[in-house]
Amino acid sequence: MSTALRIVVAGAGGRMGHAVISALRNRNDAVLHAALEAPGNASLGKDAGMMAGGAPLNVPVTQDALAAVVRADAIIDFTTPASSVALAALAAQARIVHVIGSTGFAAADEEKIKAAARHAVIVKSGNFSLGVNALMMLVREAARMLPAYDAEIVETHHAQKADAPSGTALMIARAIAEGRKLTPEDV
């Protein structure tokens, strides 16, 4: 019998962090190993399970990323570009998996993540939803089939949305560009 994967949730106090912690709660193949938040975050010191709206998990939210990755198998990260870049470097040093759902990366950040990926498995997406990824396939094909049509991306978000354009909007722009064999800047 295999042991459960030990998961670090970075951005534990956010909406996606809560969702990941809740999803891990009743799994036999994965457990919450550590919960990370930024220095000064109101969630620090709280039990991650209770913070996510459930029973205690006896995993306090911490800001100590280095201690969190010790003996971890993977990091699931919904934080900020700066935090994701730092976590990618730690994942590379520890040779663990790093799943990045953060968005808003500068080109220099992307290069640092690519460098870290030489030593760690890194999975990065602006949106992990099955529906959105199916939409990307459809957008790519429509852009290829309808080159004479203009493409426009319009989005609306909740008031707490941290980045604009969103990772999903950028994914749509890349899908249009791929369908038309252009660069995203030319779309």
Task: Cite the ranges covered by each PLM segment.
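Short, ordered loop/turn segments at secondary-structure junctions
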Residues: 38, 103-105, 127-128, 156-159
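NAD(P)-binding Rossmann-fold cofactor-contacting core
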Residues: 26-53
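Active-site-lining helix/loop region of Rossmann-like oxidoreductase modules
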Residues: 2-28, 41, 56, 143-187
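An anion/phosphate-binding loop that grips the pyrophosphate of nucleotide cofactors and donors
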Residues: 72
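Rossmann-fold NAD(P)-binding glycine/threonine-rich loop
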Residues: 85-94, 101-122, 133-142
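Structural detector of well-ordered beta-strand residues that form the stable sheet scaffold
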Residues: 8, 33, 62, 97-99, ...
